[in-house]
Amino acid sequence: MSTNTVPAKQYREIFLKGHPIMDVRAPIEFSKGAFPNAVNLPLMTDSERQKVGTCYKEHGQEAAIELGHQLVAGKVKANRVDAWKAFFSEHPDGFLYCFRGGLRSRITQSWLKEVGLDIPFIEGGYKAMRQFLIDEIDTAPGKSEMLILSGITGSGKTDFVRLRSESVDLEGIANHRGSSFGRQHEGQPSQIDFENRLAIELLRHQEREQAKLLLEDESFLIGRNAIPKTFFEKMQQAPVLVLTSTLEERLPRLLDDYVHKMHAGYVERLGEEQGFIAYRDYLLGSLKGIYKRLGGKLHAEMTELMNKALATEQSRRDTSAHLDWISLLLESYYDPMYHYQLGKKAARVRFTGTHAEMHEYLSSLGK
């Protein structure tokens, strides 16, 4: 049986170059966590894997292997090998892996060899590659000076971060804007996928040889994704840069984020009628999520303003009425909360400025 393998020392290169990977784990394993450049073409289905696992526990490895060959034989085997061939025909530079780089990788490699393809499998498999990425998250803060970009809601922190080569976009990785109204149309990655993507972005940051690591100020949770504990603790200790913006600049940004982009995204996915319903539910649901913090009276007032704005938008295609509840949300909720939180970080603040001033300051620090 072939022993054509990819050693662990190439993990970094695999992630940086985005090598296509065929993941032969069962679908249930893949769904719990995978890599951005991996495609799931399993050796066994979930039910087949379960049967083989039970057989292994009761009768040992040889019996389990024999059962596996019985379950994946004939047309079933041929169809899976055809799918693998198609993958490597499209991605001739690709690799394969299973959970530990063991038997499933070797069997898959052997069956591909039978049809004339000699495909390397990755030593250590998913488990070792995943540990490599976890270690990267833990050690990354010591490789560059971490800087935290803070700023009042609507100040444009995310847009600013995305313009800077020394930054890593945490909200982009989590697919969530990190606030009560931060949900996106596509949903968020699993926690494991979030961590894997974060680690890969940190590898890319190191590849750019940046002395600074600029991150947007975030809570421990970005939506449902948790920033890894060690990494978050370093963020809590890092110097803070405060991005300033006027109310006149902030309101159009938030109108665009909460209203224009979300409405357009839902309509694109679901059509005009269902899209508007989903968009309306997103706004009202986000407001309901902070009911306890707002209190009943304020929540009722905002709900009324929001419903009026939605009705005006639907009937007249005019979104300007949304500025009423957005203004009240800033005045009564976001702004007081921000000033309270910034007060606790006052000793860590290194610089305060507008977008232009912040760009100039960061550029003055050098690469």
Curated annotation (Swiss-Prot):
Matching InterPro entries: P-loop_NTPase, Rhodanese-like_dom, Rhodanese-like_dom_sf, SelU
Enzyme class label: transferase
Gene Ontology biological process: tRNA wobble uridine modification
Molecular functions per Gene Ontology: transferase activity, transferring alkyl or aryl (other than methyl) groups; tRNA 2-selenouridine synthase activity
Keywords: Selenium, Transferase
Domain Rhodanese: 15-138
List of catalytic residues: C98
PROSITE patterns: RHODANESE_3
Assembly: Monomer.
UniProt-listed NCBIfam families: PRK11784.1-2, PRK11784.1-3, tRNA_sel_U_synt
Purpose: Involved in the post-transcriptional modification of the uridine at the wobble position (U34) of tRNA(Lys), tRNA(Glu) and tRNA(Gln). Catalyzes the conversion of 2-thiouridine (S2U-RNA) to 2-selenouridine (Se2U-RNA). Acts in a two-step process involving geranylation of 2-thiouridine (S2U) to S-geranyl-2-thiouridine (geS2U) and subsequent selenation of the latter derivative to 2-selenouridine (Se2U) in the tRNA chain.
Name of the protein in its database record: tRNA 2-selenouridine synthase
Organism for this UniProt entry: Shewanella amazonensis (strain ATCC BAA-1098 / SB2B)
